[in-house]
């Protein structure tokens, strides 16, 4: 059976990279994520990734603690670049060819974001890892994922989290919480379900770009989503 999606935008939160730790990058977790990505590449799927930085630095929290918000957001963007390099290195060790592009210029470390080059890399079956969010303060990496998904002509945005979908309430606190198999964008926004921030949701809704929220910690979940199986929660128009 062929994959349902030809090109995906995978949103990896920084928290997903730290596993059960309280901070930093868990190399074992990163290696396992790379193996999952390699599996979908073998299906002929083209993969672009937007990575968060919350495992290293949380800009909004620091701003709430008194730091200038713009400074805090730029620090968060640098944290995403560290995560992107960690992913890139793990891919190299596993034989996956990837390129890192940053919305902030750090030319001695990573390439600047150039849409045409990113599209060419995807056509060449290289994984493209986008760092530094949108390059602008006040915008989350969720919004960056929506933006890059549209710019890369992705068929879907896949948000990889610690939870296997969107629930009626927090499944860690309520064992009776029910997983939604499907939601509309308006339902997600009106019910204030924590899918993505409102800006990202609205962008995806307006461009008719579906989102699937799934657990990156479930072995094979990424492949099952790609194959169109009942995995995670699909958010559509």
UniProtKB/Swiss-Prot annotation:
InterPro entries: AceGlu_kinase-like_sf (IPR036393), Asp/Glu/Uridylate_kinase (IPR001048), Uridylate_kinase (IPR011817), Uridylate_kinase_bac (IPR015963). UMP binds at residues 53, 73, 134-141. One of its GO terms (molecular function) is ATP binding. One of its GO terms (biological process) is UDP biosynthetic process. Its main location: cytoplasm. It is found in: Cytoplasm. Homohexamer. This is Uridylate kinase. It comes from Nitrosomonas eutropha (strain DSM 101675 / C91 / Nm57). The gene is pyrH.
């Amino acid at each position: 059976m062929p994959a349902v999606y030809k090109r995906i935008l995978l949103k990896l939160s920084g928290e997903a990279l730290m596993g059960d730790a309280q901070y930093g990058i868990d190399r074992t977790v990163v290696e396992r994520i790379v193996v999952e990505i390699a599996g979908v590449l073998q299906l002929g799927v083209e993969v672009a990734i937007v990575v968060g930085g919350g495992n290293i630095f949380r800009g909004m929290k620091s701003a709430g603690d008194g730091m200038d918000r713009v400074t805090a957001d730029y620090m968060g963007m640098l944290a995403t670049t560290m995560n992107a390099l960690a992913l890139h290195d793990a891919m190299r060790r596993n034989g996956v060819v990837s390129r890192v592009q940053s919305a902030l210029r750090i030319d001695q470390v990573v390439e600047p974001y150039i849409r045409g080059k990113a599209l060419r890399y995807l056509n060449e079956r290289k994984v493209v890892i986008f760092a530094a969010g949108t390059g602008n303060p006040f915008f989350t990496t969720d919004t960056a994922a929506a933006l890059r998904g549209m710019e890369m002509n992705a068929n879907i945005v896949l948000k990889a989290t610690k939870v296997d979908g969107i629930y009626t309430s927090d499944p860690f606190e309520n064992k009776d919480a029910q997983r939604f198999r499907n939601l509309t964008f308006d339902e997600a926004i009106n019910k204030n379900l924590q899918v993505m921030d409102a800006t990202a949701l609205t962008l995806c809704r307006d461009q008719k770009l579906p989102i699937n929220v799934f657990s990156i910690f479930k072995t094979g979940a990424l492949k099952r989503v790609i194959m169109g199986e009942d995995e995670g929660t699909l958010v559509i128009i």
